[in-house]
């Protein structure tokens, strides 16, 4: 712990952070539920939320539950990509009860919750003390309390803790607000997809733009889209680097795998001539309007058979198909190309396609804003903690 000051600090703070043992800050929490709380105050450690319906435990067993007061921390020993040996979570939602299988600690003094919620949860800070005070349990890692309390951590003054906690809470609130906006936009899109495309055999949708009343025409997807095998666009090297120019895509959820410096075998999609990459096995798909390469041949590249059709409308028609693959087989030729869909006039296609393009652009903008806020918080954590 040679470096005892963070890279970024508020004005007026210059003292080194003090090395403290966790035993100066926390003690083992042994409080049990003596009928203070019912099942509606059961806390989920995974999400730090109250489970008003409880967790399935009988009322008789609640007496064995641990009481988790506001400010207490619980050790959750499941490992993950983010937390290699488990993690601590701080109760900032109010007094409640939790499963007795989790180890909990209680502060020995008044401690700023907003600061410690972030600090004791931060893997780069907590990894070392957790590694040196856990053992492998039956279902997850278990905390050896005495060994943990003997570990040390660097701590700023209480006033600096308050400042840092206030800033990180502000960022968290911005992230939460933008996440709510994004979730709302996605729900709105789901609703529009349900109402602006025919369903249950109908030839017209429930919701239409003014001036359109004609029935939609039935077509097979194979009549709408041409497909191209992607073999010649497969990337040769998977040594990706963000400084390279050409994106490497997959039709799966991750979509962008990285960037390559290969200059041959590039699919030159453009805004004027986009394509859909269709995963032949999972049936996932993405709209692409920029040059790219791909990772594997397990997809089809789809383009319009009739360029007078609106591409974005047809893409959303494809995305709106409710189909869950039941086996590991290719789906475009054998199944999807035979699916019957409905298409309206070119003018109505244009209206609907433009509407969903604008909506998707708005969703992408909010996703980008949310990503930048999370990156901003990550930077604060790296530079404001020691």
Predicted regions and their residues:
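Coiled-coil/CHCH-like alpha-helical segments characteristic
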Residues: 7, 50-52, 206, 223-224, ...
């Amino acid at each position: 712990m040679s470096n005892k000051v963070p890279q970024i600090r508020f004005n007026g703070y210059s003292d080194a952070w003090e090395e403290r043992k966790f035993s100066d800050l926390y003690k083992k929490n042994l409080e049990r539920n003596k009928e203070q709380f019912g099942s509606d105050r059961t806390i989920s450690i995974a999400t730090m939320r109250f489970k008003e319906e409880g967790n399935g435990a009988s009322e008789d067993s609640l007496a064995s539950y641990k009481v988790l007061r506001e400010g207490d921390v619980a050790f959750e020993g499941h490992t993950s990509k983010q937390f290699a040996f488990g993690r601590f979570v701080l109760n900032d939602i109010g007094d409640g009860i939790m499963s007795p299988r989790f180890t909990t600690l209680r502060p020995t003094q008044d401690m700023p919750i907003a600061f410690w919620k972030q600090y004791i949860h931060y893997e780069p800070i907590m990894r070392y003390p957790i590694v040196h005070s856990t053992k492998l349990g039956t279902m997850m890692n278990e905390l050896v309390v005495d060994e943990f309390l003997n570990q040390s951590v660097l701590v700023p003054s209480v006033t600096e803790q308050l400042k840092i906690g206030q800033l990180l809470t502000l960022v968290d609130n911005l992230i939460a607000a933008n996440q709510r906006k994004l979730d709302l936009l996605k729900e709105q899109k789901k609703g529009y997809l349900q109402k602006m495309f025919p369903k249950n055999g109908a030839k017209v949708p429930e919701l239409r733009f003014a001036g359109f009343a004609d029935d939609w025409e039935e077509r097979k997807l194979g009549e709408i889209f041409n497909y191209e095998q992607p073999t010649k666009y497969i990337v040769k090297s998977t040594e990706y680097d963000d400084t390279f120019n050409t994106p490497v895509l997959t039709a799966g959820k991750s979509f962008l795998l990285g960037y390559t410096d290969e200059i041959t075998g590039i699919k030159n999609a453009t805004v004027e001539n986009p394509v859909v990459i269709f995963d032949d096995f999972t049936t996932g798909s993405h709209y692409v309007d920029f040059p790219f390469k791909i990772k594997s041949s397990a997809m089809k590249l789809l383009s319009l058979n009739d360029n007078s059709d609106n591409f974005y409308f047809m893409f959303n028609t494809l995305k709106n198909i409710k189909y869950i693959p039941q086996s590991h087989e290719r789906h475009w030729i054998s199944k999807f190309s035979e699916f019957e869909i409905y298409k309206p006039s070119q003018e109505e296609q244009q209206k609907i396609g433009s509407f969903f393009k604008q909506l998707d652009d708005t969703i992408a903008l909010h996703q980008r804003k949310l990503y930048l806020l999370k990156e901003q918080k990550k930077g604060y954590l790296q530079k404001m903690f020691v």
